[in-house]
Amino acid sequence: MGRRTLSQRKGRGSIFKSRSHHKLGVAQHRAIDFFERHSTVRGLVKSIEHDPGRGAPLARVVFRNPRQYGLDKELFICAEGLYSGQYIYCGSKASLHIGNVLPIGQCPEGTVVCNVESKPGDRGIIARASGNYATVISHNADNETTRIRLPSGAKKTLKSNCRAMVGIIAGGGRTEKPILKAGVAYRMYKAKRTTWPRVRGVAMNPVDHPHGGGNHQHVGHPTTLKRSSPPGQKAGKVAARRTGLIRGGNKEGAADN
């Protein structure tokens, strides 16, 4: 009888919760209001800061409260080119400048935007990672929708009053920098709360994993498992529809022949 595998020791547990005690806060657009729907609201970028576990930098933006005396402090994801001391404008009448937030229906075709709302008022959920952006493709005035191209290349149709920030998310090319040493990877994954290092099953002893043991590193038996297998056996391809290389697909130039 072997030991319990790593996935068994983790247990079912609760829903994943991010370690938010060292994070700057929630980065999102202003809550939509009357002044942003019919005019513009001006904000000042106070500082640009690093958020642990996030690739893109964040900007602390201060707005003057249009309803009462006081200041509203917001946390925005930085667009590339945004700087400390810059004024940004949010609203339907905002101009097309880097960092401004306006409805995508007001953006000309071909405009590069980021932190796009999927539904009006959700404060931005599309194209938020470092270096990401979406492109405005076309507008439909009849049903008031706008079609955009997502970072994945897929196309999506949104309501034209969904807001977006003009520009590209800062921090592009972050993943191209080599890690070079294990200490950098250790701190990187610790900030993101990811298990690291991840040891392969074939590198373990047979007491630790179903794929362990042997005179050389090999599984030694089929890795496909049925869905009803007990937890100690579930290591490999669970209830796989198919395995192996996909053969017989369309090749380049096959359509021309």
UniProtKB/Swiss-Prot annotation:
PROSITE patterns: RIBOSOMAL_L2. The keyword RNA-binding does not apply. Keywords: Cytoplasm, Ribonucleoprotein, Ribosomal protein. The keyword Lyase does not apply. Residues 207-257 are annotated as: Disordered. InterPro entries: NA-bd_OB-fold, Rib_uL2_dom2, Ribosomal_uL2, Ribosomal_uL2_arc_euk, Ribosomal_uL2_C, Ribosomal_uL2_CS, Ribosomal_uL2_dom3, Ribosomal_uL2_RNA-bd_dom. SUPFAM superfamilies: Nucleic acid-binding proteins, Translation proteins SH3-like domain. It is found in: Cytoplasm. GO terms for biological process: cytoplasmic translation. Pfam families: Ribosomal_L2, Ribosomal_L2_C. Its main location: cytoplasm. One of its GO terms (cellular component) is cytosolic large ribosomal subunit. GO terms for molecular function: RNA binding; structural constituent of ribosome. Component of the large ribosomal subunit. The ribosome is a large ribonucleoprotein complex responsible for the synthesis of proteins in the cell. Belongs to the universal ribosomal protein uL2 family. PANTHER family: LARGE RIBOSOMAL SUBUNIT PROTEIN UL2 (PTHR13691:SF16), RIBOSOMAL PROTEIN L2 (PTHR13691). Component of the large ribosomal subunit. This is Large ribosomal subunit protein uL2. It comes from Entamoeba histolytica (strain ATCC 30459 / HM-1:IMSS / ABRM). The gene is RPL8.
